């Protein structure tokens, strides 16, 4: 069986191949997972090949939203989110899921419940975090993005879809839970004072982002990019293989890949 992660600039940079190949070995599964760079314009071509050659694949920047329109089926939550990061290939059909959202909910949902949540970003990862916050019944949800119009459009879309208020803000506000749903790792994206949890999707080139270091300095609980990568990856393997993988094995492989 063959699996892959697709995106731009993933070959040699993504920890997913190391993580999944270590997991497959531990599970005794005869499978190989590779990273494939797929430019935007080549996505349809890749998907045609995937139908015949892969058992499943992960999707990362910049394809999480675009891939949805090319799939044969999409799980209800992924369709509501408007983004897919995990695809199962079954009988040459492509079925999409969003394990980013379920990973955020699993690792941060209890902190989001009844809390003010700030999400920085407006792409596929932000959509997943936003869905998790709404599912967890957060008290208030704010979206901040470098391009305010994108944050505003996303807030409006989710407010209409889920019949609850979602606020776009021109600059990050203080919140109980702060989520960095961007690749930014070397700059402060929000004020963490007063927060109880910080969630960061970034793990390249290191999960110890500037924001993670600040959260640790302030004594704030952290869910970092490695935690999220492992959880979404474990849930993806359950979809592909129908088994529960060992997250300890997966995390060890990621940390070794990153040289930590």
From Swiss-Prot:
List the catalysed reactions: shikimate + NADP(+) = 3-dehydroshikimate + NADPH + H(+)
> Where do the catalytic residues lie?
64
Chain positions recorded as shikimate binding sites: 14-16, 60, 85, 100, 203
Functional pathway: Metabolic intermediate biosynthesis; chorismate biosynthesis; chorismate from D-erythrose 4-phosphate and phosphoenolpyruvate: step 4/7
Q: What class of enzyme is it?
A: oxidoreductase
Listed EC numbers: 1.1.1.25
Q: Name one GO molecular function term.
A: NADP binding
Per the record, the GO terms for biological process are: amino acid biosynthetic process; aromatic amino acid family biosynthetic process; chorismate biosynthetic process; shikimate metabolic process
Does NADP appear among the keywords?
yes
Ligand binding (NADP(+)): 121-125, 145-150, 201, 225
Q: Which UniProt keywords apply?
A: Amino-acid biosynthesis, Aromatic amino acid biosynthesis, NADP, Oxidoreductase
Question: What does the UniProt record say this protein does?
Answer: Involved in the biosynthesis of the chorismate, which leads to the biosynthesis of aromatic amino acids. Catalyzes the reversible NADPH linked reduction of 3-dehydroshikimate (DHSA) to yield shikimate (SA).
Q: Which family does it belong to?
A: Belongs to the shikimate dehydrogenase family.
Query: What subunit structure does UniProt give?
Result: Homodimer.
Listed name of the protein: Shikimate dehydrogenase (NADP(+))
Natural source organism: Pyrobaculum neutrophilum (strain DSM 2338 / JCM 9278 / NBRC 100436 / V24Sta)
């Amino acid at each position: 069986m063959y699996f892959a992660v697709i995106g731009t600039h993933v070959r040699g940079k993504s920890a997913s191949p190391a993580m999944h190949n270590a997991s497959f070995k531990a599970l005794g599964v005869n499978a190989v997972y590779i990273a494939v760079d797929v430019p935007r314009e080549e996505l349809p071509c890749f998907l045609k090949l995937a139908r015949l050659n892969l058992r499943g694949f992960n999707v990362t920047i910049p394809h999480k939203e675009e891939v949805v329109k090319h799939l044969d089926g999409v799980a209800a939550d992924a369709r509501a989110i408007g983004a897919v990061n995990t695809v199962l290939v079954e009988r040459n059909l492509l079925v999409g899921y969003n394990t980013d959202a379920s990973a955020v909910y699993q690792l941060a949902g209890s902190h989001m419940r009844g809390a003010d949540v700030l999400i920085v970003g407006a792409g596929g990862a932000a959509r997943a975090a936003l869905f998790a916050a709404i599912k967890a019944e957060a008290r208030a949800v704010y979206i901040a993005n470098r391009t305010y119009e994108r944050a505003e459009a996303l807030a409006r879309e989710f407010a209409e879809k889920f019949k609850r208020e979602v606020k776009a803000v021109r600059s990050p506000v203080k919140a109980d839970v702060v989520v960095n749903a961007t690749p930014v790792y070397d700059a402060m994206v929000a004020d963490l004072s007063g927060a109880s949890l910080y969630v960061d999707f970034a793990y390249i080139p290191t999960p110890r982002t500037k924001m993670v270091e600040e959260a640790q300095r302030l004594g704030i609980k952290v869910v970092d990019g490695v935690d999220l990568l492992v959880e979404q990856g474990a849930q993806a393997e359950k979809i592909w293989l129908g088994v529960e993988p060992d997250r300890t094995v997966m995390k060890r492989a990621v940390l070794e890949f990153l040289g930590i």
